[in-house]
């Protein structure tokens, strides 16, 4: 399995608009996990594989940078 497939990475600089999961939660492939707000638009980030959410440290309203890892799925 490719390591990049495990990570949910911010595609753009912005802020966390919504977090739909928590650490330890099991998610399905293509399930929405986080929404980022940037340039007055919301961007939906989805799980690239099924598994358990780990490493979620952000909360709603946090500023994030493009390329930042938001969470991983194991």
Where are each of the predicted segments found?
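Short histidine-centered loop motifs in beta-beta connectors
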Residues: 11-12, 17-22, 26, 55-58
């Amino acid at each position: 399995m490719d390591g990049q497939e495990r990570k949910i990475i911010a595609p753009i600089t912005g802020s966390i608009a919504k977090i739909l999961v928590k650490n330890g939660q099991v998610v399905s492939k293509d399930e929405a996990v986080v929404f980022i707000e940037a340039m007055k638009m919301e961007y939906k980030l989805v799980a690239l594989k099924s598994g358990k959410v780990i490493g979620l440290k952000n909360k709603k309203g946090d500023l994030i940078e493009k390329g930042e890892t938001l969470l991983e799925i194991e």
